[in-house]
Amino acid sequence: LLRKQSPELYIALSVTTDSGYATALNLDFIDSVFFHPLDCLPFTQLALSRINPDLYVVTDTGFWPGLIDLLHRKNVPALLFNGRISERAARRYLLAGSLFKETFQKFHRLYMQNTNGEKAALALGVSRENIEVVGDSKYDALQPMTDEEKERLRQTFKLQANTPVWIAGSTHAGEEEIILNAHRQLMVKHPNLILILAPRRMERVEEVTALLKKENFSFTSRSSLGHAESASVILLDTMGELAEVYSLGQVAFVGRSLIRPGGGHSLIEPLSYGLPVLHGPYIENIRHVAEIAHNQGLVFQVANPEELEQKVHTLLKNPSHRLEISEKAKIFIAQQQGAANKMADIITQCLNFPKPN
């Protein structure tokens, strides 16, 4: 959106992981990609001297006290978009004394996902006039797949049209054991059921592969789908595919939520494909979205293998209920969209670019 509004704008994107760097290199609207500097003066000074930004934008929870202070001293406005401050994080920031209070107060403006984040920012001493709730741009990030694209993806994964599939996305250590326990029970009732298992971090693929072997599951990986027909588990060992892979399933589970401290990963991607979504009890980072979706009957909490198996089974055997959830989920996603447009407009205004007609 921003590139369309201001084609002459130079956009430099910082990342913190190798996988993020690899993904960013494929974004045609980004002019340069670099690893975010360590948050101490020699490194931040060097980065700013090379880039010489007119505006710094950070998303979600990227609060770098040293960098924000340096930007403030150089009169470079810093904006927070998709701002999120959980209750646990707010307590930590308050315990840190003046460090994070001063950091938040040095932002030019904070654009928060929801009123919970707004309240936390106020508690940290940010002036109310410097805070605005604009929503979460993640609702705008996914482009809907056509039926033809979904069919091509299904064929790529060598799935039959009537094969039941459930997807466990963004899983963390300790969760795969629970998920596989539930899957083993589910296969008794649904012999053809396929689990697509997607660990959050690619460096854990070998660890999860070893677990699958130890538990004697027939499995294949996304990178070698030659034997998918006989597998009950497909291990997603590629980057950047999970969002679209949700389109293959009937039910989804979202990780980093079954084991303390958890926090939860995004519910938005599976909901955008109309899937009923399950999560564990530890969802502080996504609580606001989860509560709204819970109230609309779109997501469900489970705490152990038995509850996970029971809920997946109930949803699999009730296609009419899944269809009802799917229709409601699409309406829910549409109602939450619009934050990305607002953010692009804000950046354009801050840089004094004329807004296109």
Q: PLM ranges: what are they?
A:
Residues 1-357:
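Nucleotide-activated sugar donor-binding and catalytic core shared by glycosyltransferases
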